Amino acid sequence: LFVAKTRSGELFSLLGRSKDSLGKIKRETSFFCPACGEPVILKTGAKKVPHFSHYRHCPVKPEGETETHLLGKKWLFEWLEKQGYRPQLEYFLPDLQQRADVFFERAGKKYALEFQCSPLSLSLLADRDESYRRSGIIPIWIVLDSRIRKEKGPFFSATDFLSFFIREGPASPFILAFRPDPPMFVKYVHLVPVSKSRFYYQKTTFPLSCGMKEVFRSCPPFDVSEFLAVWQREVGRWLIFCHLQRSAKREPALHALYASAIHPTLLPKEVGIPVPRMHAIETHPVLWQALIWLEFFRQRPRGGTFSMEEVKTYLRRSEKTGLVRWRKPVLAEGRDPFSPVKKYLLFLAKCGFARIRGNRYVIEGIPEPLPADRWREEREKFLKEQKALILTLFH
């Protein structure tokens, strides 16, 4: 904590005070947590920044606080202050029994900025987020950059904890992270799942001299050539080895393919196409697209029709049986979870496999399985041919 109450009830902030001046204050003044009312101790050691600490834990935020979190809060508070936002540090909201790291108001709206360092459970994070929103407060979640587990290449591991921080931006979904030392924002953009647990990303950084609008709205252009090369390699590798993964036995969608006498490598080249907002669906992109192909194209004649509502009903039913799984944080954000499905059907329509007539899709062609001896070459050729179309889907 940087802010505590004195015995008289006044708020006392440590920011801007020297360690020398705090020595006398520490000896003469008692301090209490503004949230829970318990006594706190003023620590002014040589290694850490001056801060207040509970003798036990605080029931409002029982996860405690690290030096990294203290520094991050300090930098973020000062960043907002320099922009004229008049922020309040460690603002306690008694109705919610929550303490925002930084609270501020702008243009009649209330905001709570949370710098999340501890890997809390998804349910706890979701509860805090929902409490803010119910009270008319817009939460801004920023994650500690080192919590993003990077892998070799442009990938990170997509845990439930990390998926909570995915937000929809003007140009692409993104995760906003922060490094306290040296202080900077790290923004992960153009997020596309290449498997159930791995995300492709592009990255950009912002020093604290950048303002709020630039940090949240700026986004580098999507390098589609680099991405498609990565996508082709990763999907090809998954198609070959997916049945050897430990999770294969627990993947109902994979079992559905085998039940239809289809090996993943033989799936049509039109299955396994990157589309925007696929992060909403936890199931592997190849698998949920394969299910749509099986249900709405392979088993129906040319000239047959189906509606988006029928697709939604099928996917909802598939969710109950475990065939398709959605990322819960994305659902909680209020976005349309079927957006990637609509984009995929639009892609198939533009490739000539369907015609949109009113609110129905008319089947005009059926994607065919690939030959066993040429599947890789056919996929690679198709992706190159459809590069421009895929790019339009992301804009």
Features from the language model and the residues they span:
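A short acidic/basic microdomain associated with nuclease active sites
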Residues: 79-96, 105
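Eukaryotic partner-binding/assembly regions in large regulatory complexes
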Residues: 200-258
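Extended, amphipathic alpha-helical scaffolds
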Residues: 246-395
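Conserved catalytic cores of phosphodiester-cleaving nucleases, focusing on short active-site segments
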Residues: 76, 102-121, 132
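A conserved mid-domain beta-alpha-beta active-site/ligand-binding segment of alpha/beta enzyme cores
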Residues: 162-219
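Catalytic cores of nucleic-acid endonucleases
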Residues: 117-171
